Amino acid sequence: MGTEESDDFVVQLLRENRRLKTELNRREGIASSRWWRLHPRLNAERMLTALRGPREPPRVAPSMLPREQTVPPPVPSDLVGRFRREVIGHGTFSHDWFTGHIPSWEPMMRALEGRTARVLEIGAFEGLSTCFVLWRLPDATVTAVDTFAGSAEQVARDLLPNGSLEHVFDANVAHVDGTRARKLVGDSKRVVLDLHAEHARFDFVYVDGSHLALDVLIDAALSWSLLTVEGFLVFDDYGWSAVGPDPLLRPGPAIDAFLELVDGKYEVVSKGTQLALRKKSA
């Protein structure tokens, strides 16, 4: 995809994202896949097919995904326990949605250890995954992007911590090593465009900022070109469907659509409730 086409891609997705959110609010969250309108040069037909049709397994490196859902390799015997004692036990975390993913993250952490790995996290919440990376990779730096306003779902379900979410994040990260964390407050679509302007590059990208398909697709598309070849891209909530089957209200269909767009440029590292990829070519 050329530079002009890439710019068209971003502009069109941002415009469609604003339109969709307006319509979602008007119809109280009831959406339809007919609202997808993408530029023809963006392989819109393939994206629509991926969103509307039955999910196909992503393309896989044969040695890496022998079955429908990968079984993570063993982690050091007390890695999770030490993290809970040394970090979670001294922080303020109202929810633990992360430590169950440590076994699938560990092979990627091993690949990054011993170097100054650059990590981008889209969606930080209270900083639990941020803290894990800082704790697990003492030489890594983390750029964490979040509005720190909480999602509509978190507000509706009263899942936000008492006090300022941003202050909770700051305190938790400071306990590990706040000097290696860069906090960027704002909508990820705008913030990641600013990172493009800085010519930033990352070795690991974690996309966990929204459950809306268009948000997920835009976050993935914008961060892909920031990811180094052989770097890792991890999507959270691959199978999440708590609000029903509508493809625009779930991350999974957007992730599958993104995989169609970058077909041939990645291999799957692990697949379960999260999907982890390794970028093989630009």
Task: Enumerate the predicted regions with their spans.
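A short alpha-helical cap/connector motif
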Residues: 2-282
